[in-house]
Amino acid sequence: MQLARRLALLAGSVAAALAAAPAFAQQKIDFILNWVPGGDHAPYYYAKKMGWYKDAGIDLNLEPGKGSAVAVQKVAAGANPIGLADMANALTLRGKGADTVGVFNVYANSPQGLYWLKSSGIKSVKDLAGKKIGNPAGDGARTIWPALAKANGIDANSVTWVNIDANSKLAALKAKSIDATTSFYNIHHIFQKELGDDMGFVAWKDAGLNTYGNTVIVNGDFLKKNKAVVAAFVKVTQKAFAACVANPNPCVQALVEANGALQFDNELQNWRLVEVLMSDKFSKTVALGVLDDNRMAADYELVKTYIGLDTPYDVKTAYTNEFLDHSIKMTK
């Protein structure tokens, strides 16, 4: 009886220890966003809340960003192993030695847009010559502006860039301290509300520049040494985006719960516009998150021609689709 009791106690102790211990070691990932959290980031917060990253062995920390250019630089430097950035920025900076690799595309369409006041007399990109464009210093739009300028027949240096905080864009535009600003389409509704009928707008994709937008990028060295971790991250992220397309409300709720200053209705509108940016024939027919070879080759040539590359490279080294589940596709 005594032996049986001891064995029972030992078994109970072992079971308790196993229950208290993690199933496997968690890989800490500091994932830098392209910007401050918003509706476009809802899937990451939802997957984290649901424990999907944790179940995949990832201890995820979501770090607010300060622009795509900054995100690329930090990932390339290894300060963050994984991040989110505009793909055209990643291609441009790769030519300067920034070793990052795209592994999951979010914006199949360029999210970039230009905003101005109609009352200013501006009607198109060409009218921006000699004008002031305000946005944050690290904003990705500045990096790829030369391509848009050349595509519209104006000198890229004919505009003056004014450093302003992202939250000051509308106020600066209304005060006419700047003539135009840049912003992503997923907050288009905010500009419409604030500027009303005086809002002037052109989407870059409709002005000759539809490069791939926000894409999950990975530090090249980290990818080589941690393929299983990257594969797990992409698998969860792809699953999360598909889940949010199917049912956005709980995803946006998870975002708002983690970022108390955000308002649910506003971020839900944000997400609805994100869905538009995610949708193209490749995300619908090949896989959600895919980077098409021909489009990537075209984006590379555009960057090379209009912006310039310090060091040319094989564009296929800048991205991979190997971690995607091709059974998961964009449904809208």
Q: What do these predicted regions represent?
A:
Residues M1-A11:
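Bacterial N-terminal signal peptides that target proteins for export
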